[in-house]
C-alpha cells in the first residue's frame, strides 16, 4: 500500500475498537442466524435471543445477577450452542484487552487466535470460522497493539468526522464570510465570546 511504500519502518497496528467490532459483528450475525433457524423468523419482543441481544454484548465483569441468570437460561438450551461459543470468544477477547499486563493480554489473545483457527476444530458456527480466518490473517496487526499500547487512529477519525459535519452544514454558502461564521459557530469558535 501507499503507507508501506512511504513509511517502510512503520508497524501496522489494528486497534481494539476494530478488533472488538469484528467479534461483535460475528456474535450478532450468529445470534440472528440461530434465531432464524430455531424459530423461523426474525427477533421479536418475547424471543429469548432477541431479548438478550444487548446483554450478550455486556462484559461479564459488569453483568448484574439478573442479566447473568438470563444468559445462563439462554445458554442452557442446546440450540444456542453456537451463540454460546461465539459469546465466550467475545468475552475472552474483551478480557485480553482489559488485562493490565500487556504481555499477559498479548499471550491470551495469541492463544485465542490459535484456538479458533485450529484446523481440527469442528466449525459448525460459520461466523466464528469467518472471524477466525480474519484474525489469523491480521494476527500480526492485532497483536502489535500490545507492543505499541494506546495506538489508535481514533483521534484522526474524530477530526475527519467533525470536518465532514462542517462540510455538510455549510453546503450552499457562496459568501465565504458566512461559511466561515457557520463553521466557527458549529465548532465552538465563538464559545469564548458567548461565555466569557
Where are these regions (language model features)?
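A short alpha->loop->secondary-structure connector
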Residues: 5-14, 31
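Short alpha-helix plus adjacent loop in nuclease-associated cores
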Residues: 16-40
Amino acid at each position: 500500500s501507499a503507507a508501506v511504500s512511504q513509511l517502510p519502518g512503520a508497524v501496522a497496528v489494528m486497534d481494539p475498537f476494530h478488533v472488538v467490532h469484528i467479534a461483535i459483528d460475528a456474535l450478532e450475525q450468529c445470534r440472528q442466524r440461530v434465531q432464524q433457524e430455531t424459530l423461523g423468523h426474525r427477533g421479536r419482543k418475547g424471543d429469548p435471543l432477541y431479548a438478550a441481544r444487548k446483554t450478550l454484548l455486556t462484559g461479564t465483569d459488569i453483568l448484574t445477577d439478573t442479566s447473568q441468570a438470563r444468559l445462563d437460561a439462554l445458554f442452557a438450551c442446546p440450540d444456542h450452542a453456537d451463540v454460546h461459543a461465539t459469546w465466550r470468544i467475545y468475552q475472552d477477547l474483551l478480557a485480553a484487552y482489559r488485562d493490565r499486563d500487556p504481555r499477559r493480554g498479548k499471550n491470551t489473545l495469541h492463544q485465542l487466535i490459535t484456538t479458533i483457527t485450529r484446523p481440527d476444530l469442528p466449525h459448525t458456527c460459520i461466523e466464528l470460522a469467518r472471524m477466525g480466518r480474519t484474525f489469523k490473517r491480521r494476527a500480526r496487526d492485532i497483536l502489535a497493539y500490545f507492543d505499541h499500547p494506546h495506538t489508535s487512529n481514533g483521534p484522526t477519525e474524530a477530526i475527519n468526522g467533525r470536518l465532514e459535519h462542517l462540510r455538510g452544514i455549510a453546503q450552499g454558502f457562496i459568501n465565504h464570510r458566512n461559511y466561515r461564521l457557520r463553521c466557527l459557530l458549529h465548532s465552538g469558535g465563538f464559545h469564548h465570546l458567548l461565555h466569557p
